[in-house]
Amino acid sequence: MKIAIVGTRGIPNRYGGFERFAEQISSRFADQGHEVTVYCRRAFVRPDDVYDRRVRRVIVPSLHQKHLDTWVSTFFAAVRVAFSNNDVVLLCNVANSPFAYIPRLFGKPVVLNVDGLDRKREKWKGLGAQVLHFCEWMSSFSSTRLVTDAKAIRDYYLAKYGSESTVIGYGSEMPAGDDSLNGFNLEPGRYVLYVSRLEPENNPDLVLRSWRNVRSDWPLVVVGDNPYDRGYIERMKSLGDERVRFTGAIYGDGYWALQKHAGVFVFACEIGGVHPALIEAMAANNAVLYLDTPENAETAGDAGVKYVKSEEDLTAKLQSVLDDPAVRQQLAARAKERADALYRWDVIAGTYEKLFEELIRSRNERLPGKRLQ
């Protein structure tokens, strides 16, 4: 098959979950002999990029501006893919749902992965939230097949729009590579890790305020950035005490080294479906604490310690886990076991592959002379 992946910032990953998804799934498709093209935004591409060279990159214009960047780049990508020889399009992000029609008009099946409920993010207010609500509505019918990454999101689309969807999650295997902590000045197994884009709905302020009340000499390592709001980052830094280390965004071997050697991982995102950072922490054999939302509970279940959105509860849960090495060891083992059983990239890629084949076969049955490649 010839597969196009559209709607992310591109590969290699320098931003977030969809980019990690595109990076991993494209390589798995290439492993199976498929021709894969990832459409990448110009602002996120560098001459020295390291990525799987079996995957073709197509660079499209971008604005690197919060409100229009996604639409501008995806419009150009959708037009280009419409005139390409790709057999199927994997479109990412609910905000891109209006552009599903462009390749569909040219006979290409479009699978839309909507992720979570983006319109609820605090950064989208007023007109922005209304536009995303419109995109959410369009996502319920604009693609050939809708994909949600959690049962909670599937149930939402079914209840609100009457739209069926296929639930396909994410993978979490630890890659091979340099997993040393050289340069971080951290002791393996003796730091708390928080990973997220630094935005209000990811609750870095909750974690930082709670940490001030935890009695421990462990560092809290905050990994993440916000290229669209530097002021918010400065406000978060003002909440940290001398035990907090802000690293900015980290990808590749450095990111995986921090995951692998953390003693505790605290997760505080409340908007979205399945979050890659959470399942990656589980795969890394971490003791996990997570904010109690339906999506997070579906992901981690009893393999982590859940807390409600309050400083008091998070402080108490952190203190309890930090004070008991045996509990940390038990939590880490359960998290790893759950990740290995439920979140494997090869299985995820195979599920998408079968879905693509089904859609292409259905299309070809309506078009005499066509056959599945």
Descriptions of predicted regions:
Residues 4, 183-215, 221:
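Conserved donor-binding/catalytic core segment of Leloir-type glycosyltransferases
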Residues 233-256:
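Nucleotide-activated donor-binding/catalytic signature segment of Leloir-type glycosyltransferases, i.e.
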Residues 270:
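Aromatic "clamp/platform" in nucleotide-sugar-dependent glycosyltransferases that forms part
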Residues 327-342, 351:
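A short, well-ordered alpha-helix in the C-terminal region of glycosyltransferases
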Residues 79-82, 105, 128-146:
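Membrane-proximal helix-turn-helix segments that form the acceptor-binding/catalytic region
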Residues 287-290:
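Short hydrophobic beta-strand element within catalytic cores of glycosyltransferases
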Residues 304-312, 320-326:
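Conserved acidic donor-binding segment of nucleotide-sugar-dependent glycosyltransferases
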